[in-house]
């Protein structure tokens, strides 16, 4: 029984029954409805925000990608912010370069070498966050009335963006471990104008697309000249020896707009 994990030995106490939590099975691949009830979606999102404002503050909330303050080195972050402000040049109140600070863009470009991105600072544009980057990309890539393919379920902020830009959303069947079904994407290619994915550790499912799926999706979209906006915000939160590659690593035609922090 000890070998099977049912009991454990404790010094000077003997054997006790071991707690073995029940391992729940992973959810099945989602089967989203083909209907797009944007009004109902926006009302639901508004309700989520209201619950965040008036809800029990002692409850950890997983509806937004925001860690609790106790998990962050707040004092150290504040100290570094003060140090940075004190070392800013005299013209620090002026606008920076249009694409963003050159030193930051060089640092991001160097970061992409870890997955053979080989991007240069000229390829990088800094924004006020990934949501801002996705909004800019969508406004350039798609026009009012266009249809974008997304995972199901999808981060509700993406639904808000699509709604504000007058875009239609087509949800794809999504596996909680491997992400979207490439075959399902292939079937809807004639209906879509762009694709928006969180390829690594999707929010909210947590799925991570295998490299072969990423490569297949990128090649498929490139063949039909359909741009892919890739939100890679969570790519660095991994357990293992190496960071999972983004879809951008397999992009040979320049159809992937990659965003990260």
PLM features per residue range, with description:
Residues 1-82, 260:
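N-terminal basic, amphipathic alpha-helical segments
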Residues 81-224, 235-237, 242-256:
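Conserved core of the PLP fold type I
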Residues 231-232:
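Walker B catalytic acidic pair
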């Amino acid at each position: 029984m000890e070998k099977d994990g049912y009991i454990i030995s404790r010094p000077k106490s003997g054997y006790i029954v071991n707690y073995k939590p029940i391992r729940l099975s992973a959810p099945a691949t989602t089967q989203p409805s083909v209907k797009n009830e944007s009004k109902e979606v926006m009302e639901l999102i508004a309700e989520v925000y209201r619950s965040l404002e008036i809800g029990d503050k002692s409850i950890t909330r997983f509806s937004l990608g925001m860690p609790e303050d106790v998990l962050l080195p707040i004092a150290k972050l504040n100290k570094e912010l003060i140090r940075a402000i004190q070392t800013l040049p005299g013209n620090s109140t002026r606008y920076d370069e249009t694409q963003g600070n050159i030193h930051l863009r060089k640092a991001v470009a160097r970061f992409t070498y870890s997955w053979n991105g080989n991007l240069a600072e000229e390829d990088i544009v800094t924004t006020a966050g990934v949501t801002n980057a996705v909004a800019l990309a969508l406004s350039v890539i798609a026009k009012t009335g266009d249809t974008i393919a997304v995972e199901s379920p999808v981060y509700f902020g993406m639904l808000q963006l699509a709604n504000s830009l007058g875009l239609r959303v087509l949800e794809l069947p999504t596996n909680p471990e491997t992400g979207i079904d490439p075959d399902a994407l292939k079937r809807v290619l004639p209906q879509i104008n762009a694709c928006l994915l969180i390829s690594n550790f999707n929010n909210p499912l947590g799925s991570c697309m295998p490299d072969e799926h990423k490569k297949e999706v990128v090649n498929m979209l490139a063949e039909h000249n359909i741009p892919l906006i890739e939100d890679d915000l969570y790519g660095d939160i991994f357990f293992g020896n190496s960071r999972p590659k983004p879809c951008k690593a397999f992009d040979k035609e320049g159809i992937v707009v990659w965003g990260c922090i």
